[in-house]
Amino acid sequence: MMSSIAAPKLKEKVEKFLSGKKKMYINGSFVESASGKTFDTPNPATGERLATVYEGDAEDIDRAVKAAREAFD
């Protein structure tokens, strides 16, 4: 016999934080993706949208790698 439990309700502060688009952290700053594209991430407990995040691409990877190299040089 399988049983299930209800997914816990997110706290108000967490919901508020997740409500906006989540930026990428590159070179000490939170930035949007170069393309401006986003995608939704699901809550694994409910399948509902948990957050919207910026979708990084090759240009964003290049910016992050360049910043990392400069930090270590």
From Swiss-Prot:
It holds the Pfam family Aldedh. Keywords: NAD, Oxidoreductase. Pathway: Alcohol metabolism; ethanol degradation; acetate from ethanol: step 2/2. This is Aldehyde dehydrogenase. It comes from the Bacteria. Its EC number is 1.2.1.3. It catalyses: an aldehyde + NAD(+) + H2O = a carboxylate + NADH + 2 H(+). GO terms for molecular function: aldehyde dehydrogenase (NAD+) activity. InterPro entries: Ald_DH/histidinol_DH (IPR016161), Ald_DH_N (IPR016162), Aldehyde_DH_dom (IPR015590).
